[in-house]
UniProtKB/Swiss-Prot annotation:
It comes from Amycolatopsis sp. Binds 1 divalent metal cation per subunit. Enhanced by the addition of divalent metal ions such as Co(2+), Mn(2+) and Fe(2+). Homooctamer. Belongs to the mandelate racemase/muconate lactonizing enzyme family. MenC type 2 subfamily. Acts as a N-succinylamino acid racemase (NSAR) that catalyzes the racemization of N-succinyl-phenylglycine and N-succinyl-methionine. Can catalyze the racemization of a broad range of N-acylamino acids, including N-acetyl-D/L-methionine, N-propionyl-D/L-methionine, N-butyryl-D/L-methionine and N-chloroacetyl-L-valine. Also converts 2-succinyl-6-hydroxy-2,4-cyclohexadiene-1-carboxylate (SHCHC) to 2-succinylbenzoate (OSB). Catalyzes both N-succinylamino acid racemization and OSB synthesis at equivalent rates. NSAR is probably the biological function of this enzyme. Optimum pH is 7.5. Its cofactor is a divalent metal cation. This is N-succinylamino acid racemase. The active site is at residues 163, 263. Inhibited by EDTA and sulfhydryl reagents such as p-chloromercuribenzoic acid. Both OSBS and NAAAR activities are inhibited competitively by salicylhydroxamate.
Length: 368
């Protein structure tokens, strides 16, 4: 398959409500979308970078630059590409996993559409729907938090994740447990906001029966997570630290992780995400699919990934209306706490042209 070119779009999508984490507050999702064009058809990719280098060292302007000047030209120069060849073709360029993952996603979508095969079938799906959790941002007050959590439980979400930071950890967890009981599947996400010196404070979460605490320490501090695992009872889940299947294997060997959050963009694409899944399965480590406030394009691919056998915990694969009043694809709608796995060719969804145009702020064509 020869790549004819790639259209790169900048889009801005307003969120239904501001989303606050330990590294900042978002009210608009700014992201990059890629449309890969081949003689056999086209495919879509979504780059999960943010406007600034806060969650990750990658960010939108940097991703656009490396895509335009290095990654896309490298694929255009290749005589024959498949999704499996994207990573080797781009290996000489260091880092930029999110940008590489978006390009691989677009090529994979084009390839699978041409062969009338779905993402789910290609990745190894074993179910036709996936259970959905929801991520709840840091709130101004406990009553506000309880109202929001209650609303999501009423909608049918089967797991609640609370974002935490120093000063907003034990009390919100206690309040949710007291209001909604011990049967609610509950976990917390620190987004690297703590240090090993905070272990006594994090141990205060142990009595609440949490599923996990996600990425409490800096992403490079794998040994610190291993030590923290010895000091607290709540299982440690790694997110930012897991950038590849090798990183997952190393963290498992060091005893730094009991559960893994797989984010395809963070590991360089859906094919590497499947390898992370396989490594974890081989070591008896359960996984779940994280989210990056994706559009319906990324959501479709994530739901397909989450239908693999070792995804045994509900992920952040929320319905479209969790973040967006209007998505750029047909919306994903929660039913019985689950989302359906797309079965159409490729992603199984595509942007609705008029909706995509409404949120597009710039676009450029790279190719012949």
């Amino acid at each position: 398959m020869k790549l004819s070119g790639v259209e790169l779009r900048r889009v801005q999508m307003p969120l239904v409500a501001p989303f606050r984490t330990s590294f900042g507050t978002q009210s608009v999702r700014e992201l990059l979308l890629l449309r890969a064009v081949t003689p056999a058809g086209e495919g879509w990719g979504e780059c999960v970078t943010m406007a600034g280098p806060l969650y990750s060292s990658e960010y939108n302007d940097g991703a656009e630059h490396v895509l335009r000047h290095y990654l896309i030209p490298a694929l255009l120069a290749a005589e024959d590409i498949t999704a499996a060849k994207v990573t080797p073709l781009l290996a000489k360029f260091k880092g930029h996993r999110m940008a590489k993952g978006a390009l691989e996603m677009a090529v994979l979508d084009a390839e699978l559409r041409a062969h009338e095969r779905s993402f789910a079938a290609e990745l190894g799906s074993v179910r036709d729907s996936v259970p959905c959790g929801v991520s709840v941002g840091i709130m101004d007050t406990i009553p506000q938090l309880l109202d929001v959590v209650g609303g999501y439980l009423d909608e049918g979400y089967v797991r609640i994740k609370l974002k935490i930071e120093p000063g907003w950890d034990v009390e919100p967890v206690r309040a949710v447990r007291e209001r909604f009981g011990d049967d609610v599947l509950l976990q917390v996400d620190a987004n690297t906001a703590y240090t090993l010196g905070d272990a006594p404070q994090l141990a205060r979460l142990d009595p609440f029966g949490l599923l996990l605490i996600e990425q409490p320490l800096e992403e490079e501090d794998v040994l610190g997570h291993a030590e923290l695992a010895r000091r607290i009872q709540t299982p440690i889940c790694l997110d930012e630290s897991i950038v590849s299947a090798r990183a997952a294997a190393d963290a498992i060997k060091l005893g730094a992780v009991q559960i893994v959050n797989i984010k395809p963009g963070r590991v360089g694409g859906y094919l590497e995400a499947r390898r992370v899944h396989d490594v974890c399965a081989a070591h008896g480590i359960p996984v779940w699919c994280g989210g990056m406030i994706e559009t319906g394009l990324g959501r479709a691919a994530n739901v397909a990934l989450a239908s693999l056998p070792n995804f045994t915990l509900p992920g952040d694969t929320s319905a479209s209306d969790r973040f967006y009043k209007t998505d750029i694809t047909e919306p994903f709608v929660l039913s019985g706490g689950h989302l359906p796995v797309p079965t159409g060719p490729g992603l199984g969804v595509a942007p609705i042209p008029e909706l995509l145009d409404e949120v597009t702020t710039a676009k450029v064509w790279i190719g012949s």
